[in-house]
């Protein structure tokens, strides 16, 4: 999931801060998701999926 989230963010040309603002989390939390330090809860995964225009399954199961 971490690599997918980072790749999606870079592809969308967004900063960790921009993603964090959208999902209601800090820049550090987004960084933690991107480097395997933590995983988003289901509600946050849904927001990330919406932000990156992908399915929640893609995020949760790292497809």
Question: What annotation goes with each model-predicted range?
Answer:
Residues 5, 19-20, 30-33, 59:
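Conserved hydrophobic/aromatic packing and binding residues within compact polymer-binding modules
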Residues 62:
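Conserved short acidic donor-positioning loop in nucleotide-sugar-dependent glycosyltransferases
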Residues 3-22:
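Short basic helix-loop element that most often maps to the first helix and adjoining turn
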Residues 24-39:
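Recognition helix of helix-turn-helix/homeodomain-like DNA-binding domains
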Residues 5, 16, 27, 42-45:
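Helix-turn-helix DNA-binding elements, focusing on the entry/boundary residues of the two helices
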Residues 24, 43-58:
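DNA major-groove recognition helix of helix-turn-helix/homeodomain DNA-binding modules
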Residues 8-9, 20, 34-37, 48:
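Generic anion/oxyanion-binding catalytic loop in active/binding sites
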């Amino acid at each position: 999931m971490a690599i997918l989230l980072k790749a999606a963010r870079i592809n969308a040309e967004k900063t960790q801060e921009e993603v964090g603002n959208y999902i209601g989390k800090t820049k550090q939390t987004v960084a933690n998701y991107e480097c395997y330090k933590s995983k988003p809860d289901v509600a946050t995964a849904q927001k990330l999926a919406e932000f990156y225009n992908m399915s929640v399954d893609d995020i949760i199961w790292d497809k």
